[in-house]
């Protein structure tokens, strides 16, 4: 499957992601372009970008996704932290543009007590500012559905639709559906009926064309738990049935899908999880505008 891969380490340099991806049979690569647990990063040099782009070409130009820092909170009611988050997200977008990474996944943030409506307005204002300034060029901003822990925003399709609405439907905005988060948030896509209900609802509120990436993770916690705990494919509450429905939906055959399952000292866990997912795909599936489920 040309659209299946994993989050890959960049220890030793950003360009090392491609060698690791090849070793784990990834055809999609997700990375952090900087430390996800630090605000600042050493600026990319021309050599950094050239080496990364050369390695990308040598690897056959697989789809690339970046994930932003976990420190960023575009929904913060604190003006200082909000501006700091906007500045950090600006850097994330600029780094993607420099490297040629087509999509940046972000968690919509948390309202930290100000309320969901106020938090969403805050995220929308931040995104509007950056989009109006064309920060990141053509880099897509993919809003990730969250599990809904604490005051996290983005745990419902209504939240995600509202953010797109607040940005006047900007074409650079899309959605990343994380299977662990979706289940924890209360979306039950584990049966054919539940799957159709879930993605019909998504299509009505947001538009299926906005679904531009998947994070494929099983969940240690059950439906509606609001707890974000990833586990290996088939070993959690999503189960193989839920993943089989996604893997065989003709609408999603070209959408990048990346694992974020627990790592092991070697690459065996990613190899095993990818093999499990590939084994769920029926040979008859082909790209089509309509789902067969």
Curated annotation (Swiss-Prot):
Zn(2+) 1 binds at residues 67, 107, 144. Endonuclease IV plays a role in DNA repair. It cleaves phosphodiester bonds at apurinic or apyrimidinic (AP) sites, generating a 3'-hydroxyl group and a 5'-terminal sugar phosphate. One of its GO terms (molecular function) is deoxyribonuclease IV (phage-T4-induced) activity. Gene3D superfamilies: Divalent-metal-dependent TIM barrel enzymes (3.20.20.150). This is Probable endonuclease 4. Transmembrane segments: none annotated. NCBIfam families: nfo. GO terms for biological process: base-excision repair. Belongs to the AP endonuclease 2 family. Its EC number is 3.1.21.2. Zn(2+) 3 binds at residues 181, 228, 230. It comes from Herpetosiphon aurantiacus (strain ATCC 23779 / DSM 785 / 114-95). Disulfide bonds: none annotated. The gene is nfo. Keywords: DNA damage, DNA repair, Endonuclease, Hydrolase, Metal-binding, Nuclease, Zinc. InterPro entries: AP_endonuc_2, AP_endonuc_F2_Zn_BS, Xyl_isomerase-like_sf, Xyl_isomerase-like_TIM-brl. Binds 3 Zn(2+) ions.
């Amino acid at each position: 499957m040309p659209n299946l891969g994993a989050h890959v380490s960049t220890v030793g340099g950003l360009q090392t992601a491609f060698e690791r991806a090849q070793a784990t049979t990834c055809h999609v690569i997700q990375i952090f372009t900087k430390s996800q647990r630090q605000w600042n990063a050493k600026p990319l040099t021309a050599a950094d970008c050239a080496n990364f782009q050369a390695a990308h070409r040598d690897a056959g130009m697989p789809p690339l996704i970046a994930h932003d820092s976990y420190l960023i909170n575009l929904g913060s009611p604190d003006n200082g932290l909000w501006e700091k988050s906007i500045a950090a997200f600006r850097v994330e977008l600029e780094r993607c543009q420099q490297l040629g990474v087509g999509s940046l996944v972000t968690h919509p943030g948390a309202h930290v007590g100000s309320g969901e409506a106020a938090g969403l307005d805050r995220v929308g204002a931040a995104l509007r500012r950056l989009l109006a300034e064309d920060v990141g060029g053509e880099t897509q901003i993919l809003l990730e559905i969250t599990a809904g822990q604490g005051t996290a925003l983005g745990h419902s399709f209504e939240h995600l639709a509202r953010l797109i609405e607040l940005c006047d439907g900007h074409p650079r905005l899309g959605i990343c559906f994380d299977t662990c988060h979706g289940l924890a948030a209360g979306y039950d896509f584990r049966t054919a009926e539940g799957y159709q209900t879930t993605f019909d609802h998504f299509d009505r509120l947001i538009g299926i064309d906005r679904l531009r990436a998947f994070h494929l993770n099983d969940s240690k916690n059950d439906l509606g738990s609001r707890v974000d705990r990833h586990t290996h494919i088939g070993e959690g509450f999503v189960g193989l049935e839920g993943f089989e429905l996604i893997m065989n939906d003709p609408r999603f055959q070209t959408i990048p899908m990346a694992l974020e399952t627990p790592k092991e000292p070697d690459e065996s866990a990613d190899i095993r999880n990818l093999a499990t997912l590939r084994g769920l795909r029926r040979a008859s599936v082909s790209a089509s505008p309509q789902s067969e489920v």
